[in-house]
């Protein structure tokens, strides 16, 4: 890299030596004709002309002089910045904050929304979902339905299916010779990886026997993800053919997938894949007994999503007709075909991230405007210096180049600080994405992010430097040289430019602060929503156990009940309860039918079936959460496996069932519960509504099932279906009980020590979801924008007062009142504030709908929020203006005149 520069330097030396040789020859010739040495040298120089100019012209002909001049400008810019460290640090920190926000948000958007999927032609992959008449998606697609699609669809190819055992949050246990690790186990059709267009990095994938079925020889084989191969087996190259166990069942490793390849992408744990073997249950069409699978396919050549959806809907009408039960037909009556990449991120999350990205871009613009104002002031102060350079022959282009390079040096330094700040921000962002958006990803700057950072660095340098450079370079030279000082060489144009920049800062800051205010009001509203239960002094533990170790056993009798008994006797524990779902968690929704107690469907109710949230609990849950009973009773110790099955519903359930005012006492049931002798349960109590899916979500119909009454064969609280949690109300800080609770759970089953422990207050905090994360980020963005805005107002007014020191001194000497001088400065500030606030209100009104999807209980154009933000900015701006105003009023006329 240094060779061209060394060659250029050598050419310069050779040119200088040649010119000096010509000069010596001319001198020698004149001295031979009788001239003295001094006269000969003077005449020879006059004859040759301007030697430095000859060197410059010759070097320009070589074409490398531009690099020399750039390096000169870089060295000069560094010297100038060292002479003004306060200015350099202020500009660098300001710009680094804007760059950090922009880079951090782009990294998040890139990883979550823009990253290319690790599959061939991922844009043609589609997800197929059976839908009910109510517009709700079903539990998945039945094997026979998928087989029908495979046989009849022409616009979809490679229809494949899969299922993640126990759901996305469930852990399976992979055991090798010397390892045991929790994994997500996906059961997949043999053609899945062919549909995805992915080959194994080592070994092979499953062999297909037709219609996605696996060949018999691959019935007990397994594929490992790259992460599992490296972490659990130390990247052993001899892994192929080795025997491993998943939940106690033996499999032979036949392949390792490439690094970065995962499917489904929404899982938090490393993956293994085993082939799906159709069972007898797959050969029937019933919603409750038939296994259901997620389905993915690839669009045929030339087919569109709309065309595929139309074709699949026609097929689905025939499929639905093959279900004998009307309820089953109603729940699969239509079909939805969606691009797979669009299913990975919820639409509300997508809009939230894009809104936050826009807010970060606005903050970056504010930082650029602030630095532009600083550079304009600095360039104006250096106007006489620049005029001298112009008078000595520097072209306008060279002056602009020098100022641009100075801006680029500042921007480059700011980018280095910005990438560090962005990396620190991303570490905190990962937790928020997981807990409040439900997205599991590792956030780190990649090559695309670094390219964007480089682009933003250059744009920042140009955006903040071009305007000041052109404004100063175009200024006439003679007036600047004639003035005695730099202070008196400024013009009205530069003042107007800086005032316009401050107005833009105020407008953009108000827009950000309005969005921040709307979200803060949203969080305030959500914090005051009645939850329907108490959260203080309550902690919960979500239990994770190896499912295969409790197969064919009474899980409640052998594990849960003894564990609950020991927990209830811990010091400081008031009460404890088991539950399949924690309030504000992901509740399980099923359909209940109403009966007359003899297994027959009732006909005297307003509706014969109802879709409701279902949760199995022990009687002590009422003491833990203190739900409000409206009618009847809650479960007690008399509700056992041999007594009449009982359930408790909420107010919304009654409202949907028979309307307000109905009394409990009706029978209802569902095949899922597995009550003894298939008895239907009777409703014995009505609870007040509570929040289930989230604070911002309305209450749904809910039913509580008495856990001791569920038979051992039921899948309701089985280890491979719905997770089990234990809730504990304590007399002291719940966090202090965790070590003792963990020890009790370890004694019950060693794997329970790895359960997730948290307090209900933290569960509530996490349930604020995207609003919480967005409000925190906008608090940072808005606060930074407010500081930069106030700093911009102060900087401009302080600069104007400094520039007008002589004028102010003369005014005071001529009798001007100091109060009027203060008012003059405050009037200037007020004019900028009014213009900026008016523009900002228009922008805020136009853009506030962008955050509308994040709001709860607040309108996007909330007048109180806009008024409060306007008042805050107005008061902050006037406070910033008071300091320069007092300085203007305190000018000593004698000192001001003497300084000139």
Per-range role (PLM):
Residues 105-108, 372, 408-480, 518-521, ...:
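Small-residue-rich transmembrane alpha-helices
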């Amino acid at each position: 890299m240094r060779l061209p520069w060394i060659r250029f330097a050598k050419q310069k030396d050779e040119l200088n030596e040649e010119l000096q040789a010509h000069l010596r020859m001319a001198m020698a010739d004149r001295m031979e004709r009788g001239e003295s040495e001094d006269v000969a040298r003077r005449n020879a120089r006059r004859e040759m002309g301007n030697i430095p100019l000859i060197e410059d012209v010759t070097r320009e002909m070589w074409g490398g002089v531009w690099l020399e001049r750039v390096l000169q400008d870089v060295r000069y810019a560094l010297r100038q910045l060292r002479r003004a460290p306060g200015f350099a640090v202020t500009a660098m920190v300001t710009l680094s904050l804007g760059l950090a926000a922009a880079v951090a948000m782009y990294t998040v958007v890139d990883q979550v929304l823009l990253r290319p999927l690790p599959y061939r032609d991922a844009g043609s992959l589609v997800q197929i979902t059976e839908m009910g008449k109510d517009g709700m998606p079903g539990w998945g697609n039945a094997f026979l339905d998928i087989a029908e699609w495979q046989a009849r669809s022409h616009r979809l190819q490679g229809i494949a299916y899969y299922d993640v055992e126990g759901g996305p949050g469930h852990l399976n246990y992979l055991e090798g010779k010397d390892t045991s690790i929790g994994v997500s186990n996906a059961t997949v059709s043999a053609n899945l990886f062919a549909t995805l267009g992915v080959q194994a990095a080592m070994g092979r994938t499953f062999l297909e026997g037709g219609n996605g079925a696996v060949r018999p020889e691959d019935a007990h084989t397994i594929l490992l993800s790259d992460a599992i191969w490296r972490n659990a087996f130390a990247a052993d190259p001899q892994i192929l053919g080795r025997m491993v166990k998943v939940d106690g069942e033996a499999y032979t490793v036949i392949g390792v997938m490439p690094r970065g390849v995962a499917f489904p992408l929404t899982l938090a744990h490393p993956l293994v894949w085993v082939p799906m073997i159709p069972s007898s249950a797959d050969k029937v069409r019933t919603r409750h007994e038939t296994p259901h699978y997620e389905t993915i396919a690839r669009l045929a050549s030339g087919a569109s999503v709309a065309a595929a959806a139309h074709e699949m809907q026609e097929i689905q009408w025939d499929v639905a007709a093959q279900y004998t039960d009307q309820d089953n037909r109603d729940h699969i009556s239509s079909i939805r075909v969606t691009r797979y990449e669009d299913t990975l991120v919820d639409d509300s999350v997508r809009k939230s991230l894009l809104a936050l990205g826009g807010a970060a871009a606005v903050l970056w613009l504010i930082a650029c405007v602030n630095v532009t104002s600083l550079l304009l002031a600095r360039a104006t102060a250096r106007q006489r210096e620049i005029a001298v350079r112009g008078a000595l022959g520097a072209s306008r282009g060279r002056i602009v180049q020098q100022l641009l390079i100075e801006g680029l040096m500042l921007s480059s330094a700011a980018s280095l600080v910005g990438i560090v700040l962005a990396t620190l921000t991303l570490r905190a962002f990962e937790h928020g994405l997981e807990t409040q958006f439900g997205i599991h990803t590792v956030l780190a700057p990649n090559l695309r992010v670094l390219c964007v950072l480089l682009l933003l660095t250059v744009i920042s340098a140009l955006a903040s430097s071009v305007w000041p450079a052109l404004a100063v370079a175009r200024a006439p030279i003679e007036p600047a040289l004639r003035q005695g000082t730099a202070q008196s060489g400024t013009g009205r144009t530069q003042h107007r430019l800086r005032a316009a920049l401050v107005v833009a800062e105020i407008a953009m800051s108000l827009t950000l602060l309005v969005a921040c205010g709307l979200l803060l009001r949203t969080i305030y509203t959500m914090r005051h929503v009645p939850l329907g239960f108490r959260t203080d002094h309550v902690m919960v533990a979500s239990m994770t156990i190896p499912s295969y170790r409790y197969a064919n056993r009474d899980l409640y009798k052998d594990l849960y009940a003894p564990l609950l008994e020991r927990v209830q006797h811990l010091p400081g524990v008031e009460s404890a309860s088991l539950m399949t779902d924690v309030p504000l968690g992901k509740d399980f929704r099923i359909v209940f039918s109403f009966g007359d107690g003899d297994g027959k469907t009732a006909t005297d109710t307003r509706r014969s079936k109802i879709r409701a949230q279902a949760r199995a609990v022990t009687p002590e849950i009422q003491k833990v959460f203190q739900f409000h009973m409206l009618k009847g009773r809650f479960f007690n110790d008399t509700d056992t496996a041999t007594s009449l099955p009982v359930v408790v519903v909420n107010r919304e359930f009654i409202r949907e069932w028979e309307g307000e005012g109905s009394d409990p006492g009706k029978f209802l049931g569902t095949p899922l519960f597995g009550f003894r002798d298939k008895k239907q349960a009777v409703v014995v109590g009505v609870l007040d509504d509570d929040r289930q899916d989230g604070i911002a979500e309305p209450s749904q119909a809910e039913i509580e099932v008495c856990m001791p009454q569920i038979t051992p064969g039921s899948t309701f609280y089985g280890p491979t279906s719905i997770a089990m949690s234990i809730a504990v109300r304590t007399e002291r800080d719940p966090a202090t009980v965790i070590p003792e609770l963990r020890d009790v759970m370890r004694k019950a089953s060693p794997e329970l020590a790895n359960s997730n422990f948290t307090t209900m207050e933290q569960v509530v905090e996490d349930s604020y979801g995207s609003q919480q994360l967005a409000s925190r980020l906008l608090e940072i963005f808005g606060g930074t924008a407010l500081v930069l805005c106030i700093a911009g107002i102060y900087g401009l007014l302080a600069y104007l007062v400094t520039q007008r020191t002589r004028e102010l001194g003369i005014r005071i000497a001529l009798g001007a009142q100091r109060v009027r001088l203060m008012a003059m400065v405050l009037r200037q500030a007020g004019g900028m504030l009014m213009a900026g606030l008016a523009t900002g209100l228009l922008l805020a009104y136009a853009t506030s709908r962008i955050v509308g999807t994040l709001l709860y209980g607040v309108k996007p154009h909330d007048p109180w929020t806009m008024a409060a933000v306007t008042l805050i900015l107005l008061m902050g701006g006037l406070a910033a203006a008071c300091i320069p105003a007092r300085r203007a009023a305190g000018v000593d006329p004698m000192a001001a005149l003497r300084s000139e």
